Amino acid sequence: RADAETVADLRRFGKAISGVRRSNYRGERAEVVKQRLDRDRLKLLEHGDPALWVNEPAVLGGFGLHSDRVFFNEDTLRFFRVACLLNDAALLCDFRVRTPRATLWEIGGGWGGFAHYFKTLFPDATYLITAPPALLLLSATYLMTLFPDAQFRFFQPADPAAFMHDWDTIDFAFA
């Protein structure tokens, strides 16, 4: 687990992963970005399910725009769009039913933003991230800080069978 300042520093690396930069929300660019993102947000909410909206977590160095009592950035809009597309494709049904516990597998989990988004919507799901070790370290640090009471599991090559042991109790798994 990390403190808010450390996670904010780690989020700076997120711009290389997702292209979203804190600097776009300050200074000269801020108004242009705000207009574009507000327009995009309203369009997405018009066509998507508002129940799938999750605010950007401000507590850990989150950044973005405040509008209509929501806090968001480009990643938030992307995550909302993906959640709506999954919903439209009827792929979220399994996550709404609590038994058996469903697993979502994200390949190349980035900095953990979508994992946070998804687990906020579906806390009883198991979220598996497979990625290179550097990304696993980044996403695990972020998620362990946001979800301090969650159960985490890391793949151990010396004991691969242990990874699946008591799978129904795991919130986040990394391999």
Language-model region placement:
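Conserved Class I S-adenosyl-L-methionine-dependent methyltransferase catalytic core
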Residues: R1-R98
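P-loop NTPase catalytic core of nucleic-acid-dependent motor ATPases
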Residues: V82, R101, F118
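Conserved class I S-adenosyl-L-methionine
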Residues: T99-G110
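Conserved SAM-binding loop of SAM-dependent methyltransferases across substrates and taxa
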Residues: W111-F122
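Conserved SAM-binding motif I beta-strand of class I
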Residues: T126-P132
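Short alpha-helix immediately C-terminal to the canonical SAM-binding loop
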Residues: L136-L137
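S-adenosyl-L-methionine
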Residues: Y142-A175
